[in-house]
């Protein structure tokens, strides 16, 4: 369920897609079940949309998830700010469009641009002045009136006539993607005991710490669960998981039959989401937690040292709703329903853009 406010009545350049078009450039496994959440994608012709973001996987996944769910044809445009501007907050960039490659700016602008994060917001707001309809994912940290639609998670605490509020971060977890991943990974993970626990591990962030001590604690808690509850375990690290921490997890868990992705070959992430009976995820990543709760598996949160007020609000809301519980070193299983607002948010975005 999303929280929405009345549709846009008017704005400056690019308020609705028709305006943007007119003002833009003219040369423009049998034993396993997949954790699939009900979701409907809009049936409409694909409209080109740039997804503008810093090159961070979590940010890019949110923008791509929205664009795909909205039946746009997404083209990823990673930002490349030059020295010295990359060391300055994006809202202070004198020429935001200079963060895009020259060949990008030489091309015809698309009907829609989707910004992700603070830097993406600044660039997309500038592109809106040139005629593209501007959609922003996450709190933009600048005036929301510079966008046609802003999609913000409820823990952002953002409101306004062009704001659509979602319970979780947007993502690319869809029934089709999970079903495909389940079919491809069921055989590869069939040797693991059931119930299967998927573990999604993050890493150090600006607000949470995941070093050797935290990795050792998590590894031994997971090992204790494997022994006490006789579960299979499949773990995937993230790009932020340090090599020493990965080695420690592997040293403790692999001798006990745990499977840990070594970073080679196909990424198992969606396969683990699809096939898991229970998911354990570290609390440092709102995106990973959002993707986990979009499945039909119970989700347990592995606490880490540190604090973020916004992320605390996010996690606590999911705890209060019974969708997640804290991981305490034992298997826990309870009935849950998927939480996924991406498709509804995408439909609302299309409506507000007049599509």
Q: Which sequence ranges carry the predicted segments?
A:
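Donor nucleotide-activated moiety binding/catalytic core segment of transferases
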Residues: 250-287
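Conserved catalytic-core segment of nucleotide-activated headgroup transferases in glycan assembly
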Residues: 204-237
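Leloir-type glycosyltransferase catalytic cores
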Residues: 316-355
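Extreme N-terminal starter segment of soluble prokaryotic enzymes
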Residues: 45-50
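A nucleotide-sugar donor-handling region in carbohydrate enzymes
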Residues: 145-211, 327, 333-339, 343
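Structural loop-to-beta junction motif characteristic of Rossmann-like glycosyltransferase folds
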Residues: 296-303
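Active-site and donor-binding regions of nucleotide-sugar-utilizing enzymes
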Residues: 51-165, 171
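Short, structured helix-loop element that forms part of the nucleotide-activated donor/catalytic region
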Residues: 239-253
